[in-house]
Amino acid sequence: MKTIQFVKTNDCLACEVVENIIFDIIYEGNLPTYIDVQKDTCNDAQARISMFHTITVPLLIFRVDDKEVARITGSMPADFYKTVIDKFIEL
């Protein structure tokens, strides 16, 4: 089972962009049924540090069989996020 965990805050423009990319992938039907997407909103920086070991958002954590295989954090170009998500789906 593959999992994409998306962590965001309420006041983050980059988080909205990544959320829209994920929504578009799901809406277009490009997300296989064996990939789970989890979305968490975590506005408390201390909680993000204790749970995810970073305060930076947006944060995408990619897991295969509950083992973390990749992590993207911070503001990146939208195409970068889309490309990485698409490649994870293809694997």
Model-predicted segments: where are they?
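Local sequence-structure signature of Cys/Sec-based thiol-disulfide redox active-site neighborhoods
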Residues: 1-28
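Short alpha-helical
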Residues: 13, 44, 79
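Non-catalytic, surface beta->alpha helical segment in thiol-disulfide oxidoreductase systems
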Residues: 56-91
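Short Fe-S-cluster ligation motifs
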Residues: 41-57
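Solvent-exposed amphipathic alpha-helical surface segments
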Residues: 25, 29, 88-91
